[in-house]
């Protein structure tokens, strides 16, 4: 579940909501926890989990998937159909070309998903995997440059 928590944090960061404190100030987290029947204790347990635990993302509790959608919705990051709106994100804070490409690539795959909770979760997973791959490519490039020196 720690990976799920990290995915949530990454998503919030990716979609340009600057910090968890901003979410807390606007009560987004509390509101979304309550609307998805997630207790503060469950949320804290999710945060405190050991990072070495393997997560089975396929079996993620629907409440957490809907929690992610709720955060995006309350953050005004969705279009009228409930899908991520890159232009709205860009208005909050300019999006880099790399992030824009990743967002659109994930949207191409998942924007037909009718279940908004599943959509939000799949988008977060796609974004996370894309960033992991991007980081691996960047790291490989750095290592190649060091070898060439």
From Swiss-Prot:
Xref: Gene3D superfamilies: Pheromone/general odorant binding protein domain
One Pfam family per UniProt: PBP_GOBP
GO BP terms in the entry: response to odorant; sensory perception of chemical stimulus; sensory perception of smell
Positions of disulphide bridges: 32-70, 66-117, 106-126
InterPro entries referenced in this protein's UniProt entry, alphabetically: PBP/GOBP, PBP_GOBP_sf
Example GO molecular function: odorant binding
Superkingdom of this protein's organism: Eukaryota
Gene Ontology CC annotations of this record: extracellular region; extracellular space
Alphabetic keyword roster: Disulfide bond, Olfaction, Sensory transduction, Signal, Transport
Signal peptide: 1-16
Function (record text): Present in the aqueous fluid surrounding olfactory sensory dendrites and are thought to aid in the capture and transport of hydrophobic odorants into and through this fluid.
Annotated family: Belongs to the PBP/GOBP family.
UniProt cross-references to PANTHER family, sorted A to Z: GENERAL ODORANT-BINDING PROTEIN 57C-RELATED, ODORANT BINDING PROTEIN-RELATED
Protein name (Swiss-Prot/TrEMBL): General odorant-binding protein 57c
Organism in which the protein naturally occurs: Drosophila melanogaster (Fruit fly)
């Amino acid at each position: 579940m720690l990976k799920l928590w990290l995915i949530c944090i990454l998503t919030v960061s990716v979609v340009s909501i600057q910090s968890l404190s901003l979410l807390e100030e606007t009560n987004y987290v509390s509101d979304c926890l309550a609307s998805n029947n997630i207790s503060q204790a469950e949320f804290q347990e999710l945060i405190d989990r050991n990072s070495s635990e393997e997560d089975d993302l396929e079996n993620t509790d629907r409440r957490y998937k809907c929690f992610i959608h709720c955060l995006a919705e309350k953050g005004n990051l969705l279009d009228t159909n409930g899908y991520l709106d890159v232009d709205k994100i860009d208005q909050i804070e300019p999006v880099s070309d790399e992030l824009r490409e990743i967002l659109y690539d994930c949207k191409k795959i998942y924007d037909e998903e009718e279940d908004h909770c599943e959509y939000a979760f799949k988008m977060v997973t796609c974004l996370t995997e894309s960033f992991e791959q991007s980081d691996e490519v960047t790291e490989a490039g750095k290592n190649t440059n060091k070898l060439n020196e």
